[in-house]
């Protein structure tokens, strides 16, 4: 209900002024005081799986370039490309062997530069996935580092003697199973690897490492990159005394005892490194997105930095912790996100998280629920990051046999851990044998859902998920209330309908989302609060507004402009 609207609108106006004043501190802003990335819609591209231009079964730079018009038409402002640097591909590019080139499987540096130029012509920014914590064990730095204890790059990595002969320096475990220490018999020391043994951690306490990594970002900025998504930024530093982590009981999928990662994650020194990376980014009006797995908003706030001088967009995964349609849970998460000290970010799926189509779907109304979830995270204040194929309703397709698994996590953790292949399948461009992704067998199988959920077919259907995404993104780009308006929750005891206002100056947009499988009719008391009606901006099915009431289909959406 809107009974408190008149009193609240004054407070909202004051808050709007405060928010705009804070935003005006941004180095380069638009007329409304916003940096380019604040109003942008980001789109994550997994390059192996997006578009294959040379028909080798693997996506590439030229494939991405060929789909720029599609992305522009969708409403995308920035593309985040997951790792594309040269790599042995032990962990699909998160093991980098050269930070200043493109992996041949994806094309050449010239291909990338062409992509950046073509994207710029369309007003699309390019964001690269940058892995600052570790390299490949095939990187020239590490090959030199392990060559002798006195090599020039020895201190670029973390080498230590064993606690006693035959035992690693401490009890730290790798996130992918087993000890986080690998013994090198040639130099009789262990090196540290938070991830796989083929991904040795860099020593960020070494000033030469820090300077080199800063310089690498400059190298890419000069080639047209508008920012970086920083992988695993919370683990850049480790306790120099290598204290054992507390053991918490129980065992993970790899059989290791669970630990509290007290001494090898989230150390305070991380923030100094982030401030350095941000200083370089500001020279180029670039954005830094951070992979920050935080337990709550208070911890997330640390990564914005004092005075917002670290990450502009620390990734908030709070929505991914709500895997059911619960108005109460989403109200709680939205309130937490809106209390953050910096600009919010919204993510509901990515290359490490099962697709939202399956996580929230009930098996019967999945298409409607996909539209509902889009309506939620695209009508909130902040920067949304879409995962490729979300706009189609792509499904998570989990392998059923170990021999079909490509992801090393799935191969080593099977059957308890089946890996991430399911959310990395080829983009579904049409209903052909390989979904228009390639003319040869793709690196991962195309899901059966490509027959019904693909770009070609959905582009022709005005009621498709894709058509609804296009409508929402167009609305988001043009509606000031959705871009900058404050959030005002409504009917907070309603267990079936999540509803709220986005209020900007004296204008308001009503968002009503039915998170139940039964029709709902909600009285918002519009006339009592000085409004004649709610004019539909976007709605699903037969969801509509009449007088004070909004009627919603099962899992229905109504987004309306309040009119006086």
For every predicted segment, state its role.
Residues 1-9:
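Bacterial N-terminal signal peptides that target proteins for export
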Residues 525-540:
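Solvent-exposed beta-hairpin/edge-strand motifs
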Residues 546-564:
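C-terminal beta-strand-rich structural cap/linker in extracellular carbohydrate-active enzymes
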Residues 37, 241, 245-263, 271-281, ...:
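Loop/helix patches that line or flank the sugar-binding groove of alpha-linked glycan CAZymes
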Residues 9-18:
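Bacterial N-terminal signal peptides
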Residues 136-146, 289-323, 394-406:
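Substrate-binding cleft/loops of secretory-pathway carbohydrate-active enzymes
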């Amino acid at each position: 209900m809107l009974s408190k609207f008149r009193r609240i609108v004054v407070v909202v106006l004051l808050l709007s002024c405060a928010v705009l004043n804070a935003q005006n501190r941004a180095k380069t802003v638009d007329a409304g005081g916003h940096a380019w990335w604040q109003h942008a819609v980001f789109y994550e591209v997994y390059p192996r799986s997006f578009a294959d231009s040379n028909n080798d079964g693997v996506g590439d730079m030229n494939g991405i370039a060929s789909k720029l018009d599609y992305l522009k038409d969708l409403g995308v402002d920035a593309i985040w490309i997951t790792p594309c640097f040269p790599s042995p591909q032990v962990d699909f590019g998160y093991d980098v062997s050269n930070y200043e080139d493109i992996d041949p499987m994806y094309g050449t540096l010239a291909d990338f530069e062409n992509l950046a130029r073509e994207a710029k012509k369309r007003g699309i920014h390019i964001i690269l996935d940058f892995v600052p914590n570790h390299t490949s064990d095939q990187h020239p730095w590490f090959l030199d580092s392990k060559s002798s204890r006195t090599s020039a790059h020895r201190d670029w990595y973390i080498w230590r003697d064993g606690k006693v002969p035959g035992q690693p320096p401490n009890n730290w475990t790798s996130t992918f199973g087993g000890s986080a220490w690998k013994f090198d018999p040639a130099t009789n020391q262990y090196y540290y690897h938070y991830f796989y043994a083929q991904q040795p951690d860099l020593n960020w306490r070494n000033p030469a490492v820090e300077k080199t990594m800063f310089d690498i970002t400059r190298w890419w900025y000069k080639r047209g990159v508008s920012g970086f998504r920083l992988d695993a930024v919370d683990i850049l530093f480790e306790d120099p005394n290598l204290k054992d982590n507390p053991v918490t009981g129980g065992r993970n999928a790899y059989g290791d005892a669970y630990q509290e990662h007290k001494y090898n994650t989230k150390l305070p020194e991380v923030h100094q490194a982030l401030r350095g990376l941000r200083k370089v980014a500001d020279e180029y009006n670039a954005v830094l997105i951070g992979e920050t797995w935080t337990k709550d908003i208070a911890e997330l706030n640390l990564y914005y930095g004092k005075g917002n001088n670290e990450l502009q967009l620390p990734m908030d995964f709070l929505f991914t912790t709500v895997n059911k349609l619960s108005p109460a849970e989403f109200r709680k998460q939205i309130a937490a996100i809106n209390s953050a000290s910096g600009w919010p970010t919204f993510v509901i799926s990515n290359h490490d998280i099962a697709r939202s189509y399956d996580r929230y779907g009930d098996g019967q109304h999945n298409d409607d629920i996909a539209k509902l979830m889009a309506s939620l995270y695209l009508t909130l204040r902040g920067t949304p990051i879409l995962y490729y194929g979300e706009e189609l309703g792509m499904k998570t397709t989990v392998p059923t046999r170990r021999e079909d698994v490509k992801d090393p996590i799935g191969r080593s953790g099977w059957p308890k851990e089946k890996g991430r292949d399911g959310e990395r399948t080829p983009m579904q461009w049409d209903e052909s044998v390989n979904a228009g992704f390639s003319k040869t067998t793709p690196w991962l199988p195309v899901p059966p859902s490509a027959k019904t959920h693909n770009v070609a077919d959905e582009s022709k259907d005005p009621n498709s998920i894709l058509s609804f995404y296009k409508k929402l993104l167009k609305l988001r780009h043009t509606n000031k209330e959705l871009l900058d308006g404050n959030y005002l929750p409504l009917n907070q005891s309603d267990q079936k309908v999540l509803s709220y206002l986005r209020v900007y100056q004296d204008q308001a947009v009503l968002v009503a989302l039915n998170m139940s499988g039964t029709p709902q009719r909600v009285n918002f008391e519009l006339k009592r609060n000085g409004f004649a009606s709610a004019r539909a901006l976007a709605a699903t099915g037969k969801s509509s507004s009449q007088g004070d009431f909004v009627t919603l289909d099962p899992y229905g959406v109504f987004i309306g402009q309040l009119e006086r």
